[in-house]
Amino acid sequence: MKKPCLILALLFALFSTGFSAGTKEKPNIIFILTDNHGAWTLGCYGNPDIQTPNLDRMADEGMQFMKSLSTNPVCSPTRATYLTGLMPSQHGVHSFVPQHTMMGDEAYYMLEEFETLPEILHDEGYVCGLSGKWHLGANMKPHDGFSYWATMPRGGTSSLYNDPVILDGKLIDKSPKYMTDLWTERGIDFIEQNKDGDKPFFLFLSYNGPYCLSRLLLRPAKNRWAGYYADKHLPSFPRDTAHPWQYSNLDYHNNIVSIRRVAAEVSGVDDGVGEILATLERHGLDENTVVVFTGDQGWMGGQNGFFGMGDHTKPMAAHDMMMHVPLIYHHPGSIPSGKSDAVVTNCDFLPSVLEYVGLESRIPEKPKLTGKSYAPILRGEEVEWPIDMYYEMESCRSVRNERWKYVERRSPEGPGELYDLEIDPMERVNLFNQKGYEKIQKEMAEKLYAFFDKYADPEYDIWNGGRSKARRHHAPADHPDYREPKPRPWKAAVEKGKIYEK
């Protein structure tokens, strides 16, 4: 972590003494969450090709976490973790939730039994609003203290245009506009409704973009940035040969149409962030509002031959870039400008936000959280930080520290992985079961077992016969979570070589 100077630390210690429990004195909170979004796609994380001026400004003025990792590579589990602080083997959502749990007679909310961030904030006097993707079940009605509810009846999108949406309690067959703009406008509407209220507000602005998946990647972008990227080569997307484990998304790999579409959607999200920041400044709310920007999970765009997330490979993958998400906090006058190298995860988000706004007494005690509050970092303080980070995707689990990364898979077994991140940060040389590494391999495996033995709920511990609230991707044929694999429409697209560019 970059150490702030002593004078800066003393100033923030003097003026940033925390927030009162009185409702009016607590800051507003805007939590902006993007969908399938690798940190490497943003200018402030080093991308030279994709235009993200608003997020770059937000990072320059606020606290940017350089090593923020997701504990799972799929939408529903990671969103459940952000809202509860729990690992998938604790909250039970191991994969994306199926359509019948979101709409219809069988719909149910996946986190009903847990205390969630919006529920706690509502209890403490916040007005809570959702604008955007939900993907945690029972989408038609608000949950956990939300009084404003603009969302969609499903989890994904096939185009970011003309998708069905739920607005003002009604299901609308086709959205009236580009989804990124729609969620921005609804978010601004919520801010406008509550800007002069006597209670603080919490806005969960949950974009579908950049998404980086589905057949939309075979169609050129249509948003404001389409023309800008139409002739760009975008070399920040490596043109590596597809990895042998790449199970899906082969028709997008090295496809210049797909690459340009991703870039345009990232810039489209940046536009939305800019409008939110401008709205706060226009109403004089910027110094009383903490804005958090992050992604649900990381995404790879050709690095090491992977295109997508960890559930798009067979076996399931646990590459760092599938976990690495942007994380930026912006609160002028309260959060100092800087960068942190602390390895933080989405398990740390809930306790950090609650402590930052003075509600540390409301951090849930049961189930026991695996995360730790990084609120002291937001205040410019130097803190000791854990170096071990844990990840799970159904039968695949991993543990990493500053130097080593260990990956183990069960049901089906293997292959195992061990990497020396100090000399091999891109995880290209697998040292698993190699001579000379027996001791560190054993130590890392024991750490992994001890962590899940301590925290996993037996009901949801997949390694030990537990179940998933969502249907499994890869389950043994005799397991109740098993589902037949869908046919993969790669071949026709791959044969159309004219849309590819090296």
Predicted features by range, described:
Residues 83, 155-172, 246-253, 274-278, ...:
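Substrate-binding rim/cap in mid-to-C-terminal beta-strand-loop elements of soluble/periplasmic
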Residues 21-27, 34, 39, 64, ...:
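Long, internal low-complexity/basic segments
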